């Protein structure tokens, strides 16, 4: 059975409402149809053991080149949604399957229908409020264009790009689900207090003292490879993911569940 690690982070913000002080969130990313073959039962048990109040899914449930496994992954999310509010935003694999229907048919629509039926809250360039004791936080889901995942000729992200998709952030504490961590500075400038990201699979191979070796655009030793990052008043928690796709290996890089404990202060 493949090992799964749980990384726990304490995140502090003066903006966090008092009712949310100590709230715990579990974050999953990059399950990729479970091609890598972790025990989803074990993962479910680990999440339940953490007793989160919310579950965040930061994209890439499926793998664009693979057509099996989505039912198993959706089944996991249904079990989670029966216990907790589960919030999902697309990763680049969902976006590609959605755009290229001539190649992938109705896979995207089937996935979205299955997630809705499972009770998952889908936030693709939208937001929902989560309320507690008369106070609330905002949870946003960002789906950026495929051009921002290109290996060559990737454009820079204009200052108003994010607000053009999801508007300006509302007053109060805001969580942004944004699959691609490479634009963390833009997410922070937009006004996200906490960002959940994935995409880079921890750099595929991790070396002692050096971190991840390779990201999806074939950058060696990328700055954003996993863990906690700060940019002014924003924090990003970058999960190392739970699966693989094109390169079906993870060396010194076990699949990762992320647990975030939010604190006012």
Give residue ranges: language-model regions:
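Acidic, histidine-bearing metal-coordination/catalytic regions of metal-dependent phosphoesterases
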Residues: 1-35
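Beta-strand-turn-beta hairpins that frame and shape the catalytic cleft
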Residues: 13-26, 120, 127-139, 169-171, ...
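Acidic/histidine-rich helix-loop elements
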Residues: 25-41, 61-71, 95-106, 148-156, ...
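Binuclear metal-dependent hydrolase catalytic cores centered on His/Asp/Glu-rich metal-binding motifs
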Residues: 98-120, 127, 132-174, 184-185, ...
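Conserved beta-sheet core of the metallophosphoesterase superfamily
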Residues: 180-258
């Amino acid at each position: 059975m493949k090992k799964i690690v749980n990384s726990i982070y304490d995140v502090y913000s003066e903006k966090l409402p008092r009712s949310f002080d100590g709230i715990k969130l579990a974050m999953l990313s990059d399950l990729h149809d479970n091609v890598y073959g972790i025990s989803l039962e074990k993962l479910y048990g680990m999440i339940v053991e953490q007793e989160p109040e919310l579950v965040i899914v930061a994209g890439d449930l499926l793998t664009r080149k693979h057509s099996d496994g989505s039912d198993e992954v959706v089944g996991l999310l249904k079990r989670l949604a029966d216990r907790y509010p589960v919030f999902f935003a697309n990763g680049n694999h969902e976006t590609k399957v959605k755009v290229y229907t001539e190649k992938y048919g109705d896979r995207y629509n089937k996935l979205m229908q299955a997630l809705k039926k499972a009770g998952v809250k889908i936030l693709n360039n939208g937001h929902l409020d989560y309320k507690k004791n008369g106070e609330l936080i905002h949870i946003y889901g960002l789906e950026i264009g495929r051009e921002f995942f290109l290996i060559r000729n990737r454009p820079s992200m204009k200052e108003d790009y994010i607000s053009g998709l999801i508007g300006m952030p509302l007053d109060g504490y805001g969580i942004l689900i944004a699959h691609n961590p490479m634009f963390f500075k833009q997410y922070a400038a937009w006004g996200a207090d906490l960002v959940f990201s994935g995409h880079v699979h921890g750099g595929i191979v991790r070396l002692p003292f050096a971190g991840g070796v390779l990201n999806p655009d074939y950058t060696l030793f990328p700055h954003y490879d996993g863990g906690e990052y700060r940019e002014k008043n924003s924090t990003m928690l970058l999960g190392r993911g739970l699966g693989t796709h094109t390169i079906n290996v993870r060396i010194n890089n076990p699949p990762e569940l992320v647990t975030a404990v939010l604190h006012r202060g």
